[in-house]
A protein has these predicted regions:
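Short helix-loop-beta junction
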Residues: 37-51
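Short, solvent-exposed amphipathic alpha-helical segments in soluble enzyme
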Residues: 38-42, 89-93, 122
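A structural preference for short, hydrophobic beta-strand core positions in alpha/beta folds
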Residues: 52-53, 106
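Peripheral docking tails and interdomain loops at the edges
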Residues: 105-152
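Cofactor-cradling patches in redox/metallo enzymes
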Residues: 58-117
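Short, well-ordered coil/turn elements that cap or connect secondary structure elements
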Residues: 45-47, 99-101, 120-121
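Long amphipathic N-terminal alpha/beta scaffold segment
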Residues: 1-36
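Cofactor-binding loop segments of dinucleotide-utilizing enzymes, especially the Rossmann-like FAD-
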Residues: 27, 55, 109
């Protein structure tokens, strides 16, 4: 049913592309992709170019992370199964990213259930609903762009 209405949702009220790109990923091996899919529709409706990924393991996670230029990577973490691995891998992935200003946002059930386990360097924790997530992520990039333009 969600798939049937997806195209209608995306086209209804859609804004022009905003030029921002987003990789939305679940944790490796996750069975909980519906929430990420639904969130992606909110970002698309706001004009974002969204890539969805559901990696099968940590190697796939790394490949997806570094597969293209992204302004933002959003990680939806449903369990604590890979928290330590992801936390340890992020600095390497950020250092090797094509975009040196890449922003990483953390969300999903773990952001609400155990936010204290997700306070990692160079990441922003998202709690709340999809509309709030889109607003916070978009505003963060807008503020970064404004700071850069003021220094030029």
């Amino acid at each position: 049913m969600l798939h049937d209405y997806s195209a209608e949702f995306v086209t209804e009220g859609r804004l022009e592309p905003n030029g921002y790109s987003l990789l939305l990923m679940t944790e490796p091996g996750s069975q909980h992709g519906l929430g990420v899919f639904m969130l992606s529709e909110f970002f698309r409706r706001a004009g974002w170019n969204v890539t969805l990924a559901n990696p099968v393991d940590m190697n796939d996670f790394k490949r997806n992370f570094q597969s293209d230029w992204f302004d933002v990577v959003g990680l939806s973490l449903a369990t604590d199964r890979h928290l330590i691995e992801i936390q340890q891998t992020l600095p390497e992935l950020l250092a090797g990213s094509v975009n040196s200003a890449l922003r990483v946002f953390l969300g999903g059930p773990m952001a609400s259930l155990a936010p204290d386990t997700m306070t990692w360097p160079r990441t922003v924790l998202l709690k709340g609903n999809a509309i709030e997530a889109v607003e916070k992520v978009t505003q963060t990039l807008f503020n970064m762009e404004r700071q850069i333009s003021q220094t030029l």
